[in-house]
Amino acid sequence: CMALSFGACQDIVTYNDNYDDEMASSGAPVIDAVYDSKDRDKLLPITDGNLEQMIVLDGSNLSRVRKVMFNDVELPVGEVYATASSAYLPIPRQIPLEVNNKLYYETELGSTTYDFTVSVPLVQVDGLYNEFALPGTSVQLKGKYFDLYGFGGANSTSTVKMNGVELEVDSISDKYMSV
């Protein structure tokens, strides 16, 4: 003799408990303050920053970013981590052509600007490598920010001269330039 018994229960429970994933925005973005990312307690708001500095925007409706600009330099949206109340982003490593000292922030629901100054560093020359080079050989200028100012390459906008003669730039990085 064989007996079969089937039973079923529905044990699906939905819990909401007012959960907020911090991604919902309800209007145009508002920036209340900007902080250095190292200031985890958000104690000292900043009004200026340096190239490549990580900053945190504090405000509301900051999720769903479409565009961020410092002066006229656009930051790729993929570099922004944003929730409704904060956005973490780097200041782009590029010198602006037009300086208006504004941070422009655009989302799906609107845009805003915030007064923010980006400090642009000057070219810094610290010294030479191979300072006793023979005529016709290359030397390296050591320093910082050579790549920001248009030295070398097909689209160069800056030149290096020695005794009035323009030198050809062989290679360049942010910390050295070979001429």
Predicted regions and their residues:
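C-terminal motif of bacterial Sec signal peptides marking the signal peptidase cleavage site
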Residues: 4-8
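Short, surface-exposed loop motifs enriched in S/T, G, D/E and P with embedded aromatic residues
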Residues: 74-80, 116, 166-171
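Aromatic sugar-binding surface patches on proteins
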Residues: 80-90, 171-178
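Beta-strand/beta-sandwich contexts
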Residues: 10-63, 109-155
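Short, surface-exposed loop/turn segments at beta-strand-coil junctions that are enriched for proline
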Residues: 91-97
